Structure formats: structure tokens, C-alpha cells
């Protein structure tokens, strides 16, 4: 990208939209994310109708970022709702982590903390709000159980030297995308994200499990094997997603 000339207004970067062919190729995968999410039948049925009327290249009408997180947790073995409350909206499992932190519930896989309160490790979740735009965990704690538009990403790498945190999330410009968030530290707080593309983060959901290496992502088989970077996906029926959760 060419930087704007001096005094020229900076225009936000716009990610390219998926083509109908790309949307068709990933439709079955996204249907699988929804299948791992309770109470999502109506969403899949509605999308089936859209596909039948407009073709399989029609994009998903409902945001699927929480479904992606739910699918990851299902694949990780967190099938018990007492461990992780898989849901079509992020605020459901955010609230579960807040309650677990407040009550000491040892069954829950995550506990909620404010940004900078605890050290961030791979497997943790970082969350922000848009409606409302929460600026602290306290603000959400006062609205437990109330619907809210939120988004969470999974931490996959913490780079202390470069002061960066890499995260992966779903439905980021209609894709599963990894991004790098700048971070900072001070005498009172460990390394923590500054913001997510200018939007404040309000919650750090800490995974209650043994820590792994902060750079474990670098040694992941999918990154070591260049063949895994090819985007060809197996062709399966997108109208009949299945899951073991």
C-alpha cells in the first residue's frame, strides 16, 4: 500500500469481498461452525433458503464469528456447556467467564479479567464490544445476560520482544483471519494489547489450563507444511453440516 501524501486524509483500508466462487468454496466449512453451536438451526435453514434461491455463492446473512469460536472449542474437547457455553453470540460465553471469575467456578474453562490484569497466553480470548462499545469488564459485568454486539479472537502467539500479540478470529471481513495487535507493558501491567485496529478491548478471557510456549504457533504443522497453505477445501454437502458436540 502506498502511504497517503502529507496532509491528505487517510482512508481506511477496505478488505476485498469474497467472490461468489470463494463464498461457495467455504460455505460448507462455515455451515460446520454453525453446527457446533446450539440453537443455530434457524440460521442454517435460512441460509439454505438463500442458497436455493440465489445459488451457493450467496454470502452468509448472519455473523458467524461466535460460531467459529464455538467450533474451535468443540474441536478442542470443550463439549460440556459447563466448561464453555457455545453460542451464536460472544456475550454468552463472556458472561460465563465473568461469573466463573467472580464465583471461582472450577468447571469453567475460562475466567474473565480486565485488559492488563493477567499475563496473556496462547489459548486466551481477547474481546471488544461495538454495541455497546465497552471500555472495561466492569461495564459488561453490570449487564450480564443482556444482548450485546461483541467480538472475540483467540490468542495464538505472544511476542514479548516485538511487543505484539497474534490472534485468529472468524467472520473478519467474511473470512477466518489472523491479525497482529500491537501491545505494551509497564511496571504495573504485563504485556497487553493497546487496541484492536483502534477499537478498545474490554475483556481478557484466560484459559484455565497448563501454559504452552508463547511461540507454539511457529512450530504448528500447518505452518511448517506449505501444502496446508493452499486454499483448496474438500467438497462436502453444505446443506447437511454435522458435528459431534
Locations of regions flagged by a protein language model:
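Residue-level marker of intrinsically disordered, low-complexity segments enriched
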Residues: 28, 41-42, 156, 166, ...
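Short regulatory "switch" loops immediately downstream of catalytic or recognition motifs
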Residues: 77-78, 127-137, 180-187
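Phenylalanine-focused residue identity feature
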Residues: 13, 60, 68, 84, ...
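Low-complexity, Gly/Ser/Thr/Pro-rich intrinsically disordered linker/tail segments
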Residues: 171-245
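Repeat-unit-sized solenoid/scaffold elements
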Residues: 81-88, 93-112, 188-212
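...with weaker cross-activation on analogous glycine-rich loops/strands in unrelated enzymes
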Residues: 85-173
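N-terminal capping segments
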Residues: 1-81, 221-245
